[in-house]
């Protein structure tokens, strides 16, 4: 067999016997063991490429990959070369602390993901040399004959050669929520993947029936493999925070190195000692660099990650925490994300009228009501009773309990009918005793119905369900609520069907009749005209309970929500209307687009159409990927949610991919940045809120650290330029940076979220971290800080203090001003006093720790010796606190003035 045959042939377009010949196999005996071994060597194992995880060393080294860290490493090395070992130790200590924190948090995220992974190896039933074997799916090769039965996971792409009532749930691959009834009939070559009824795809689940198929593709050549390739090809988009921090760090690095070079140059021009000037230039660089920034970013994101984990959202990559906060569009998969992925009967129509079934999910608790919400006793309505019995007994599904959760084994549609009967009091196990099945006509795509014969005491009864029009052909009468039979009103039944389908419901008809003859005589020839129509059962995969409120919250936050699904447009529209994506009135033109309509759009029309529409139905994985790319090209920050294999490429392409942890596939989880452990779309609302809070706190830290670091650097530059003694020594600057960044700045990461955080629009993705307001605030505070430090330093010297005492005063002034300024940075929109002193207890703890540290460096002899400090008296402290208070008043006034001007007269 040619190695290219399997990959290039449209097997769905050929008759089954031609596919068998093409692959040199046998429809009953399969391949020989020898031929299978040769093909395994030629084609390789039936596996997808394994994603290589970063090694321990690579993950450690990644923590040092930051421009600011590079500068600190160089500065530390040069400082050590100059034999300033204390300074070098402090610099390297800051770098190591940052690396440790980052590594620990990344490891925690990876461990959380590992806990979600289900390491399951599938097996397949294969016929070789006429004998059935069970073997690992990895050993399958093109041409193998595979047997399928209900509950099996399809192990490779199969061209079916025979089947009986075979149905396959392809929702993980195509997004369609209802199982696909398979057959072996050849199809046109251009038939879309979702409509290829004669192919069973790798990774999908057999829900009913049995069959056999020839393997036509394995591993990377399967449709699942094609999606895997799309995942690998999808561009990993930098998060808004990552991109901004990268630019910001490069800008700071260049600016700080420029200032250091300027300092060194000025010192040389003034003929100062080259080594001392060089040391001062390094001190300026170290002082001006916000070395706490990488650590602050890591810790702030880690805190956000921990908060999200408590709300059942596991973050795989730390920057994803902030990305949700800047999201402008959420693309949500319908099945299993906005909906329960549990087909549920919503309404039962009988010739007597419509009856609503309350409740969702598989738990057997329900109330049957009429349209006026009045309870309907089952035994008081014969048609309702027999419709429920038909749905429960003419059924191959099973309702099982897994711990506290109820699950369906088999076809979801049959499961829905089984569940509603159980909810109405008809226990499936008891029915197997009171109405035992003695014969059956299984469902097939040609027959379009299923009928079963049951023993009812000494008589027999026929129960059936199927497509409405097919069941109408089988029914000659209809049953009333009193059990009386009357002529079938076909037109009324069709109108009721149209009414139910217009609500996005899938409708099946039920019927019953008296069984004649023996079970051996029961076949499809005895059914036509012998049944009485008992009702219509209308079902859907209902929206999650909190989906509508979550969508509304996203809209209030200025975030557009779009549904992307492989399901039919009618079903998608109905769900979208229920959750608030579409108005209850007729959807506006262009608000719902199908995959075919998307394919017909020109390149110029495509971006605007995608931006305008709210629902995308019958879309392929490639189209999902292109949709995300088009939205990103329009300037959107895109979050994509999903749980299926078909979602994986778009999950990876999106700025943040959100996978479902409970019902999601492993492919989707691996492609995602965040995994929701409760599979609840509403959790995304909480994640967006946390993400916005994270960015707020990062902004507060930057607002605090930039002026203080710049002030430290400018003090040295000014001293070199003027040619006087340094007000603060390099070692003292390192002390300030090391202690205040940890004890003061990092405490801002624990600030609670601001009021109204979910009522403001998303942040402009193009807005830089270094805004005009921040530049002005930085210049204001750093100027005040430098001026006050110089004033106090000069005052102390002029009033008889020694150089050590004057520098100690300036050192403590820097720290106290930074502590006071910290409170001003707790909110960028409100007064610090309105927040409450104890709203963030970490601030109080940090300030207290910093106070103890300042006492130690000022009054402990050992610290005095290392840092060249000296004790200062109470009068100096009074001056320090007076200056800090004055600066705080100036900053508060600067914060309030814009709001005062903005108020109407």
Curated annotation (Swiss-Prot):
Gene Ontology CC annotations of this record: plasma membrane
Give the enzyme's EC designation. 7.2.2.-
Q: Which domain of life is it from?
A: Bacteria
* UniProt xrefs under InterPro entries: ATPase_P-typ_cation-transptr_C, ATPase_P-typ_cation-transptr_N, ATPase_P-typ_cyto_dom_N, ATPase_P-typ_P_site, ATPase_P-typ_TM_dom_sf, ATPase_P-typ_transduc_dom_A_sf, Cation_transp_ATPase_P-type, HAD-like_sf
Would I find ATP-binding among this entry's keywords? Answer: yes
Stated membrane topology is: Multi-pass membrane protein
Q: Where does Mg(2+) bind?
A: 643, 647
Q: What induces it?
A: A member of the dormancy regulon. Induced in response to reduced oxygen tension (hypoxia) and low levels of nitric oxide (NO).
Q: Output the PANTHER family linked to this UniProt entry.
A: CATION TRANSPORTING ATPASE (PTHR43294:SF21), SODIUM/POTASSIUM-TRANSPORTING ATPASE SUBUNIT ALPHA (PTHR43294)
Q: NCBIfam families this protein is in?
A: ATPase_P-type
**Gene name?**
ctpF
What are the UniProt keywords, alphabetically? ATP-binding, Cell membrane, Magnesium, Membrane, Metal-binding, Nucleotide-binding, Phosphoprotein, Translocase, Transmembrane, Transmembrane helix
> What name does UniProt use for this protein?
Probable cation-transporting ATPase F
Q: Where is the active site?
A: 333 (4-aspartylphosphate intermediate)
Q: Which SUPFAM superfamilies does the protein's record reference?
A: Calcium ATPase, transduction domain A, Calcium ATPase, transmembrane domain M, HAD-like, Metal cation-transporting ATPase, ATP-binding domain N
Tell me the protein family, please. Answer: Belongs to the cation transport ATPase (P-type) (TC 3.A.3) family. Type IIA subfamily.
Q: Which GO terms describe its biological process?
A: intracellular potassium ion homeostasis; intracellular sodium ion homeostasis; potassium ion import across plasma membrane; proton transmembrane transport; sodium ion export across plasma membrane
Locations listed in the record: Cell membrane
User: What does the record give as the reaction this protein catalyses?
Assistant: ATP + H2O = ADP + phosphate + H(+)
Molecular function, one GO term: P-type sodium:potassium-exchanging transporter activity
Membrane spanning stretches: 64-82, 88-104, 248-268, 281-301, 716-736, 738-758, 778-798, 808-828, 842-862, 872-892
Q: Which PROSITE patterns match?
A: ATPASE_E1_E2
Q: Does the keyword Ion transport apply?
A: no
């Amino acid at each position: 067999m040619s190695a290219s045959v399997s990959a290039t042939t449209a097997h769905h377009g050929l008759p089954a016997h031609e596919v068998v010949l093409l692959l040199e196999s046998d429809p009953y005996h399969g391949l020989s063991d020898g031929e299978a071994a040769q093909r395994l060597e030629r084609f390789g194992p039936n596996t997808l490429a394994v994603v290589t995880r970063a090694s321990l060393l690579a993950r450690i080294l990644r923590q040092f990959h930051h421009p600011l860290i590079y500068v600190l490493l160089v500065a530390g090395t040069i400082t050590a070369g100059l034999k300033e070992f204390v300074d070098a130790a402090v610099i390297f200590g800051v770098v190591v602390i940052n690396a440790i924190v980052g590594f620990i948090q990344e490891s925690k995220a990876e461990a959380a993901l590992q806990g979600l992974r289900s390491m399951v190896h599938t097996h397949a039933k294969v016929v070789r040399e006429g004998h059935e074997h069970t073997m690992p799916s990895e050993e399958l090769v093109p041409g193998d004959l595979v047997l399928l039965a209900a509950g099996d996971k399809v192990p490779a792409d199969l061209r079916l050669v025979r089947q009986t009532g075979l149905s396959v749930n392809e929702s993980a691959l195509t997004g369609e929520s209802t199982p696909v009834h398979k057959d072996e009939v050849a199809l046109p070559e251009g038939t879309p993947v979702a409509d290829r009824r004669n192919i069973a795809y790798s990774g999908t689940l057999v829900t009913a029936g049995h069959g056999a198929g020839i393997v036509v593709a394995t591993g990377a050549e399967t449709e699942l493999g094609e999606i895997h390739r799309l995942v690998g090809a999808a561009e990993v988009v930098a998060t808004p925070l990552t991109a901004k921090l990268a630019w910001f760090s490069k800008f700071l690095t260049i600016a700080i190195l420029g200032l250091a070079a300027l300092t060194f140059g000025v010192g040389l021009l003034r003929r100062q000692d080259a080594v001392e000037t060089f040391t001062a230039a390094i001190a300026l660089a170290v002082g001006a660099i916000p070395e706490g920034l990488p650590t602050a970013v890591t810790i702030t994101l880690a805190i956000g990650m921990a908060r999200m984990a408590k709300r059942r959202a596991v973050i795989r990559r730390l920057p994803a925490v902030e990305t949700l906060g800047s999201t402008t569009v959420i693309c949500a998969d319908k099945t299993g994300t906005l909906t329960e992925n549990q087909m549920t009967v919503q309404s039962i129509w009988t010739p007597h009228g419509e009856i609503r079934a309350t409740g969702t999910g598989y738990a057997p608790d329900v109330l049957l009501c009429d349209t006026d919400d009045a309870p309907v006793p089952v035994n008081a309505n014969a048609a309702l009773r027999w419709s429920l019995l038909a749905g429960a007994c003419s059924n191959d599904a099973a309702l099982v309990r897994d711990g506290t959760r109820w699950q369906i084994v088999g076809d979801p549609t049959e499961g829905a009918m089984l569940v509603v009967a159980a909810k109405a009091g008809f226990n499936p196990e008891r029915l197997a005793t009171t109405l035992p099945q003695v014969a059956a006509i299984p469902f097939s795509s040609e027959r379009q119905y299923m009928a079963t014969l049951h023993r009812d005491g000494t008589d027999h009864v026929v129960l059936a369900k199927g497509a409405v029009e097919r069941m109408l052909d089988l029914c000659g009468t209809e049953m009333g609520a009193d059990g009386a039979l009357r002529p079938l009103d076909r037109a009324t039944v069709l109108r009721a069907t149209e009414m139910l389908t217009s609500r996005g419901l899938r409708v099946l008809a039920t019927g019953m009749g008296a069984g004649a003859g023996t079970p051996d005589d029961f076949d499809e020839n005895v059914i036509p005209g012998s049944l009485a129509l008992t009702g219509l059962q209308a079902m859907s995969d209902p929206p999650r309970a909190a989906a509508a409120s979550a969508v509304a919250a996203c809209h209030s936050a200025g975030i557009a929500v779009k549904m992307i699904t492989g399901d039919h447009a009618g079903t998608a529209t109905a769900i979208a209307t229920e959750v608030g994506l579409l108005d209850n009135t007729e959807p506006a033109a262009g608000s719902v687009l199908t995959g075919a309509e998307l394919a017909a759009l020109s390149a110029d029309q495509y971006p605007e159409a995608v931006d305008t529409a709210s629902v995308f139905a019958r879309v392929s994985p490639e189209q999902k990927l292109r949709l995300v790319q088009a939205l990103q090209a329009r300037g959107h920050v895109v979050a994509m949610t999903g749980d299926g294999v078909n979602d994986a490429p778009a999950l990876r392409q999106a700025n943040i991919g959100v996978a479902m942890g409970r019902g999601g596939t492993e492919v989707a989880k691996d492609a995602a940045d965040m995994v929701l452990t409760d599979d609840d779309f509403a959790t995304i609302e909480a994640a967006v809120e946390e993400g916005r809070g994270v960015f707020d706190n990062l902004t507060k830290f930057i607002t605090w650290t930039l002026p203080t670091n710049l002030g430290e650097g400018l003090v040295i530059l000014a001293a070199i330029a003027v040619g006087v003694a340094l007000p603060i020594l390099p070692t003292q600057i390192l002390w300030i940076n090391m202690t205040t960044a940890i004890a003061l700045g990092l405490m801002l990461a624990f600030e609670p979220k601001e009021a109204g955080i979910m009522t403001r629009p998303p942040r402009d993705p193009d807005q830089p971290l270094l805004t005009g307001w921040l530049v002005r605030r930085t210049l204001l505070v750093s100027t005040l800080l430098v001026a006050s430090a110089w004033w106090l330093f000069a005052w102390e010297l002029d009033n008889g203090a020694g150089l050590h005492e004057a520098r100690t005063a300036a050192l403590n002034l820097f720290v106290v001003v930074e502590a006071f300024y910290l409170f001003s940075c707790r909110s960028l929109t409100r007064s610090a006093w309105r927040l409450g002193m104890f709203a963030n207890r970490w601030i109080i703890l940090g300030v207290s720790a910093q106070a103890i540290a300042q006492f130690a460096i000022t009054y402990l002899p050992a610290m005095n010796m290392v840092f060249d400090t000296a004790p200062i008296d109470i009068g100096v402290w009074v001056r320090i606190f007076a200056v800090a208070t004055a600066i705080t008043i100036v900053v508060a006034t600067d914060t309030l003035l814009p709001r005062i001007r903005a108020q109407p007269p």
